[in-house]
Amino acid sequence: AMVFQSYALYPHLTVAQNMMTPLRMRDLDRAGRLPLIGPLVARAAHRKMRDQVAEVAETLQITPLLDRKPGQLSGGQRQRVALGRAMVRAPVAFLMDEPLSNLDAALRVHMRAELSELHRRLQATFVYVTHDQAEALTMSDRMAVMMHGDILQVGPPNDIYLNPASLDVARFIG
């Protein structure tokens, strides 16, 4: 599942509908995806999807937001909705491309802790792309330092910080 810095939420759909979209596309046929008759045609599937969305929303503490539209949410709330849309599919891996870059500094620190806790709880693989050394060092259990498309060093953050493989890695890590 993928999470981007731009959130990629549908502005005309509610939080619940945004989170349900990948499930609808994966689990329903054409008739089941139709706006008015879909819920009637595939009642059991729709009920199961609503339950999955509710469970993930509870995990991310966004249950009170399920009936709101993205324009009514803060940046951190939008980020959690985008993450929830990825989580609801129960993927084995997450690809996150600069997911916190649009947030203010205080919210970034808070979301770092939330994502780290989520990673521990889900036990899924997270590939996390960031240009922020603090994010990389605090959130990862294994990291790769890349420059100009080349991998310069791979290892636990503490090893990379204490024993940089090159001057470029040392400059980047600080």
Each model region followed by its residue ranges:
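Serine-hydrolase catalytic-loop signature spanning alpha/beta hydrolases and amidase-signature enzymes
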Residues: 6
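ABC ATPase nucleotide-binding domains
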Residues: 9, 14-168, 171-174
